[in-house]
Amino acid sequence: MTLGARLVAPMIILLLFIPIELVKAEVITLTPETFSDKIKEKDTAWFVKFCVPWCKHCKKLGNLWEDLGKAMEGDDEIEVGEVDCGTSRAVCTKVEIHSYPTFMLFYNGEEVSKYKGKRDVESLKAFVVEETEKAAEKAQLEDKEL
């Protein structure tokens, strides 16, 4: 095998994995420095998971939140975020998080709803899409009244 052939094979293998990384959905980690500004983004819903690393219920979620992020790709009105209440205690105190995990939906900076349903991607996605539509309609009505 020539030197060129030996270099081509690893490059092909590497290129096979690049699209996977480019398609990887982004779950945005929110911190005390970014939380307030992000959830106040106009006409944007933020579905946020509040957890701590030591919580067995949070650990049990596995890749659920990342899978939801992938499922929500392409929806410009909905962002998926997470807050580590161990390192971002101020955020969790501000929004009154008392148990883990807690899932909250925000729209235009306001809390819309807490999710307490089944913990699977389909249920989470259905919830966030439906609640975001309601929040957007409400915001449009309020804008018209101004």
Swiss-Prot record:
Residues at the catalytic site: 55 (nucleophile), 58 (nucleophile)
Residue span(s) of domain Thioredoxin: 26-133
GO cellular component, one term: endomembrane system
Gene3D superfamilies: Glutaredoxin
Signal peptide residue numbers: 1-25
Keywords associated with the record: Disulfide bond, Redox-active center, Signal
Keyword Transmembrane listed: no
A Pfam match: Thioredoxin
Site keyed Lowers pKa of C-terminal Cys of active site: positions: 119
Keyword Disulfide bond included in the entry's annotation: yes
Intrachain S-S bonds: 55-58
Cross-referenced InterPro entries: PDI, Thioredoxin-like_sf, Thioredoxin_domain
Family the UniProt entry places it in: Belongs to the protein disulfide isomerase family.
Free-text function comment from the UniProt entry: Acts as a protein-folding catalyst that interacts with nascent polypeptides to catalyze the formation, isomerization, and reduction or oxidation of disulfide bonds.
Name of the protein this chain belongs to: Protein disulfide-isomerase 5-1
Organism whose genome encodes this protein: Arabidopsis thaliana
